[in-house]
């Protein structure tokens, strides 16, 4: 069984005559352990595709199955739980919580997650973040913020990691 599957998924923005199809009907399957790169020119729908995969948006049409279950009828609270437990997001602009110190970003995951997590000390060492833990995101360089965002995305041991230009701002 696929970890995630899209069946005839489309995404449209606007209304009436100003309707823009950002993603044409798309079928896609991702199996456990599989790595996939989505490439294409600017404006081709790559980010829209990733936000649909990660349940950050709902499709205009089609079905998204996660672990074989249709997620199209989930309420926002259930979708948020899916995002937290099943996905790690690494976005072009770091998605760290601005009012939490870096160490608190990880402690928040500790409090909210019931999953076994990746060893934080290993991530901190691997991504050279030891000196950043007591700082707020705004106090870090762009590269430090991006490395902290990568560590946070990996820390909850997600089934699926979605990265949209993850090397942006890395030093």
What kind of region is each of these model predictions?
Residues 18-20, 71-88:
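ABC ATPase NBD coupling module
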Residues 54:
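Helix-to-loop junction immediately C-terminal to a conserved catalytic motif
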Residues 62-70:
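Conserved ABC transporter NBD signature motif
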Residues 70, 115-132:
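Conserved ABC ATPase "signature" region
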Residues 84, 135-138, 155-156:
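Conserved signature/switch motifs of ABC ATPase nucleotide-binding domains
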Residues 100-107:
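Short coil-to-helix segment of the ABC ATPase nucleotide-binding domain corresponding to the Q-loop/switch region
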Residues 136-140, 144-146:
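Conserved ABC ATPase signature
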Residues 161-164:
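Catalytic Walker B motif of ABC-type/P-loop ATPase nucleotide-binding domains
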């Amino acid at each position: 069984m696929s970890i995630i599957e899209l069946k005839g998924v489309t995404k449209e923005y606007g209304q009436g005559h100003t309707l823009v199809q950002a993603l044409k009907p798309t079928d896609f399957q991702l199996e456990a352990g599989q790595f996939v790169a989505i490439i294409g020119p600017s404006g081709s729908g790559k980010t829209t595709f990733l936000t649909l995969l990660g349940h950050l948006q709902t499709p205009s049409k089609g079905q998204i199955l996660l672990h074989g279950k249709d997620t199209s009828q989930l309420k926002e609270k259930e979708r948020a739980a899916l995002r937290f437990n099943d996905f790690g997001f690494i976005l072009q602009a770091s998605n760290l919580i601005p009012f939490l110190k870096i160490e608190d970003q990880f402690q928040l995951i500790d409090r909210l997650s019931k999953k076994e997590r990746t060893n934080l000390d290993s991530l901190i060492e691997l991504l050279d973040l030891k000196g950043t833990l007591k700082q707020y995101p705004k106090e870090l360089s762009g590269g430090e913020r991006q490395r902290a965002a990568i560590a946070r995305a990996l820390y909850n041991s997600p089934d699926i990691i979605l990265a949209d230009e993850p090397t942006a701002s890395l030093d």
